[in-house]
Amino acid sequence: MHLNLHKKAFKKALLICNGYEIYHDDITDIVDNLYIIDPYHQKQNYLESLAVFKQYLKTNNINSSTNIIYASGLEDKTDIKEYLDKEFYICGNNLHKFTLLSNPYNLDKNLFLNNVVLPEISKKFHYKYISKKKNSSGGLNVGNNRNSSNIYYQQYIPGNTYSVSFLSNEIESQILGFNQLFSVRDNAKYPYLYAGAMTLNLDEKELNYYKKWIDNFSSLYRLNGFCSIDYKIYNNKIYIIDINPRLSGTYRLYKKQYKNLIHHHIGLTSGKLLSVNNKYYAYIVLFAKDDYVVNESIYNLKDISDTPALGELIKKNMPILTLNFKSNDKNKILLKIKDGIKSAMKIIDCYNVNLEYE
């Protein structure tokens, strides 16, 4: 019997995400027929309702034999998440687990010992707190809202926001790396809108401390695949801000640093990841300051992805494109980021980005 080296792991898969490009090539290497639902890049929103979603599945002959690969887009779609969990196999973590862990206040209190803590929360507005909608993602539905339903108020923690990206196999974790997260500057409607990330170094002592906590967390909730945790450091305490038991934006940083990352996420292999380089990586998502019609000037920008079509109308506060950076030196990459944003703002009416860096 001869092994077919071109046979792929899955016959059919459905990718659900806001921004498909960073996952597309990796997934098509292992899937014969890939279907994509991406509200950011498709005219029709197939996640508008469960009925619309079911019609999309029927039209494309997508049934329970199709594997679901989830990144984003279902944060407030409870009925679609429940339907997918019941009828399909979800690569990585199921959507019930995603919903549970997306709210850190659902976590077992025994995880929060010593200097790993959660910000205080309140049901009432307080000027030192920020408003957050349950299952918020990417800085959306986070701000200073006093009158919306389905929100809570979280103690504001000053300082930079970081994240740790890791793989889990239900028992233990492998830390991929640590990142600083960036946000859009001077956006009144979305003051905490996520706008990119940059990889960081961490010494061995700190690495072991984080790994012990993440191993306990991963084992307790039997996590699978690519996950990330957003946090802040203040007064010698680590404040857990958000937990993402799913593919997230920092995947684009580590797909360049490790070999076959998507294979590990969907469970095709359980071995240790092989690092292919030790460079620093970063990316910046540019958001439209006003409605913007794409023209040829964007092609003057270097190393861009998630590129819109010429003539496409980008609505205010929606992503336009992504700038990508790499360097062998952590100081040089920050300079590249600053220069890249400056160049982009000369030709695109986009928001600036907060780049506080320690």
Regions found by a protein language model. Name each.
Residues R146, S168-S173, I233-K237, A288-K289, ...:
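Short acidic-glycine loop/turn motifs at beta-strand connectors
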Residues H263-E358:
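Peripheral (often C-terminal) accessory segments that flank ATP-dependent C-N-forming ligase machineries
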Residues P158-T161, S165-Y221, N244-I266:
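ATP-dependent carboxylate/phosphate-activation module, predominantly the ATP-grasp catalytic core
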Residues M1-N93, D339, N352:
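ATP-binding N-terminal substructure of ATP-dependent carboxylate-amine bond-forming enzymes
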Residues L111, H126-V142, N150-V164, L176-Q180, ...:
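ATP-grasp fold ATP-binding core
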Residues N135-S136, Y156-N160, Y221-G225, N278, ...:
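A short catalytic or substrate-binding loop motif that flags glycine-/basic-rich loops and adjacent residues
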Residues D85-R146:
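A conserved helix-loop-beta module that forms one wall/lid of the active-site cleft
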